């Protein structure tokens, strides 16, 4: 009887010890998580003020301070993806979900990163996906029919000047139709007029009982840009009233590492999408979000295409080096 009581007491003691140890661990984690959130908040504030490298340091420090804190990992992942490190950013956001982050919150930020990576299989199966049915169906189709680029190593095409509102215009060949597309930093991908919904050169994805064209996902089966031929290009639609007019975002051009020259009215494109690390010029950090491309300046962060960015660039040629999150501007 005494032996049984001693054994029972020992088991109780062990349970209490384990519970106490768990409380100690939780007590140590909570302050670290709170510290990490403060570092993230400070980093966000610094980033808005244009202090990109100081913000980066704090994002990293928040993750080191609380390695399993989902909010800290999500913040670092979002930052790195915006700076062009798409794959690393995606992995960090996936880890944020693994460590308890809300799948819908993480999915909202992860979906556009998967799209820019061209990882359509991951996009179509994303937990907590924010995508409507049409875009999920498009992602599934693109996962089995991957986009491609064919053409020379590099080529120069005409950049048509415009009065305002865009960075210029280029000619695209969609199917067998030649159209003029304005380069708009606020646009994602290619945006065609709704008249293209009736054309065979654009594949459509829509819910059976949804007649709203705004919810339709499209894929242009072929898009020519000068001597380059792009196949299976994700496409959106807008009611412009003109079949021959379109808009393209810098994310679409980024895959060809474009150099825009407002003086000679030309644009140089590169099939590899890569820029030599030793390329001369002033390097301006950029942040790429679904709402557009932003330039990081000493006095803040400004949208490319806005007045402040136009003042910074002037008429100098510039190259978008999306892989390294920078704009390379020709020296004055």
Language-model regions: role of each:
Residues 10, 25-26, 41, 76:
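N-terminal non-cleavable signal-anchor helices
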Residues 4-20:
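Bacterial N-terminal signal peptides that target proteins for export
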Residues 22-31:
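Hydrophobic h-region of N-terminal signal peptides that target proteins for export
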Residues 34-36:
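Boundary at the C-terminal end of the N-terminal hydrophobic targeting segment
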Residues 41, 48-332:
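Pepsin/retropepsin-fold aspartyl endopeptidases
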């Amino acid at each position: 009887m005494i032996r049984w009581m001693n054994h029972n007491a020992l088991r109780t003691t062990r349970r209490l010890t384990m519970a106490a140890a768990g409380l100690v661990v939780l007590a140590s984690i909570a302050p670290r998580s709170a510290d990490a959130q403060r570092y993230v908040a400070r980093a966000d504030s610094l980033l808005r003020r244009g202090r990109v490298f100081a913000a980066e340091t704090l994002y990293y420090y928040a993750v080191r301070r609380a390695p399993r804190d989902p909010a800290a990992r999500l913040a670092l992942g979002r930052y790195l993806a915006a700076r062009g490190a798409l794959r690393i950013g995606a992995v960090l956001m996936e880890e944020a979900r693994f460590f308890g982050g809300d799948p819908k919150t993480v999915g909202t930020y992860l979906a556009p990163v998967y799209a820019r990576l061209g990882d359509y299989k991951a996009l179509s199966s994303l937990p907590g996906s924010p995508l409507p049915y049409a875009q999920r169906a498009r992602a599934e189709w693109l996962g089995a029919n991957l986009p491609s680029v064919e053409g020379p190593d590099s080529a120069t095409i005409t950049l048509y000047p415009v009065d305002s509102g865009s960075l210029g215009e280029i000619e695209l060949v969609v199917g067998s139709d030649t159209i003029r597309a304005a380069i708009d930093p606020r646009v994602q991908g290619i945006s065609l007029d709704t008249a293209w919904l009736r054309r065979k050169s654009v594949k459509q994805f829509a819910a059976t009982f949804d007649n709203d064209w705004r919810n339709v996902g499209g894929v242009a089966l072929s898009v020519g840009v000068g001597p380059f031929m792009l196949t299976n290009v994700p496409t959106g639609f807008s009611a412009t009233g003109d079949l021959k007019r379109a808009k393209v975002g810098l994310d679409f051009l980024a895959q060809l590492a474009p150099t825009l020259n407002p003086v000679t009215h030309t644009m140089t494109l590169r099939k590899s999408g890569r820029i030599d690390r030793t390329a001369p010029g002033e390097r301006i950090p950029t942040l790429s979000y679904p709402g557009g491309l932003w330039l990081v300046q000493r006095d803040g962060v400004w949208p490319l295409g806005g007045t402040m960015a136009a003042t910074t660039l002037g008429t100098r040629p510039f190259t978008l080096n999306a892989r390294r999150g920078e704009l390379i501007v020709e020296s004055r």
